[in-house]
Amino acid sequence: MAYTKIALFAAIAALASAQTQDQINELNVILNDVKSHLQEYISLASDSSSGFSLSSMPAGVLDIGMALASATDDSYTTLYSEVDFAGVSKMLTMVPWYSSRLEPALKSLNGDASSSAAPSSSAAPTSSAAPSSSAAPTSSAASSSSEAKSSSAAPSSSEAKSSSAAPSSSEAKSSSAAPSSSEAKSSSAAPSSTEAKITSAAPSSTGAKTSAISQITDGQIQATKAVSEQTENGAAKAFVGMGAGVVAAAAMLL
């Protein structure tokens, strides 16, 4: 809390004398270190071999440090106008604990100052145009939907043409032409009843063909039988005639 108050009042004093942020941070580091380690500064100033003396301390720093050690109010802030900020920058590197205490504290203050200033400068990303450019997915969705429509429409039209045209024409030709011409030729070319039976039975099943052939075979057998009977009857009649002639000749001879 005390360090915060020191930093606050140092900042006020620096602003009053138009000091830079780096000088304000250096003053804050010196004031806090003098307040916390006042005896070390007195001992260092008393050692002639250290190269550091009370006379070499920046104006106003020792007075403010001593006032802070026993301060009960903020009256010590009136001493800020007496601070030699150029001497403060030089004093930082003169003390033997600069690298162990002052430099880390100064870097810490510079880091806090840069981080506290960052939000004001980082307000620009909030106005980023990235969200507005995210409307692009709508255009990609539109293209995908149009592609889906075109891709789904094309197959249906081509399939409709192929399925409606080719089979109907080929079936009509095959069903109307071939059977009628073959049947007309077979029916008009049949000269006899036997051939008519054969041609009429041809388009039927295998059983019909077999029955027609058997009928033809039976007719041939009957014809052969009739011829053989006629032959046998003729031979018998001829033999009987020949016998009668022989008997008549014998009678005449007697």
Curated annotation (Swiss-Prot):
Residues 1-18 form the signal peptide. Residues 114-143 are annotated as: 5 X 6 AA approximate tandem repeats, Ala/Ser-rich. O-glycosylated. InterPro entries: SRP1_TIP1 (IPR000992), Yeast_PIR_rpt (IPR000420), Yeast_SRP1/TIP1_CWP (IPR050788). One of its GO terms (biological process) is fungal-type cell wall organization. Induction: Induced during anaerobic growth and by cold shock and glucose. A lipid is attached at residue 233 (GPI-anchor amidated asparagine). Keywords: Cell wall, Glycoprotein, GPI-anchor, Lipoprotein, Membrane, Repeat, Secreted, Signal, Stress response. The keyword Magnesium does not apply. Residues 113-197 have a biased composition (Low complexity). It comes from the Eukaryota. Pfam families: PIR (PF00399), SRP1_TIP1 (PF00660). PROSITE patterns: PIR_REPEAT_1 (PS00929), PIR_REPEAT_2 (PS50256), SRP1_TIP1 (PS00724). The record marks 220 as: Covalent attachment to cell wall glycan. Residues 110-213 are annotated as: Disordered. Its main location: secreted. The keyword Glycoprotein applies. Residues 144-203 are annotated as: 5 X 12 AA approximate tandem repeats, Ala/Ser-rich. Component of the cell wall. Required for anaerobic growth. Belongs to the SRP1/TIP1 family. The number of the intragenic tandem repeats varies between different S.cerevisiae strains. This is Cold shock-induced protein TIR1.
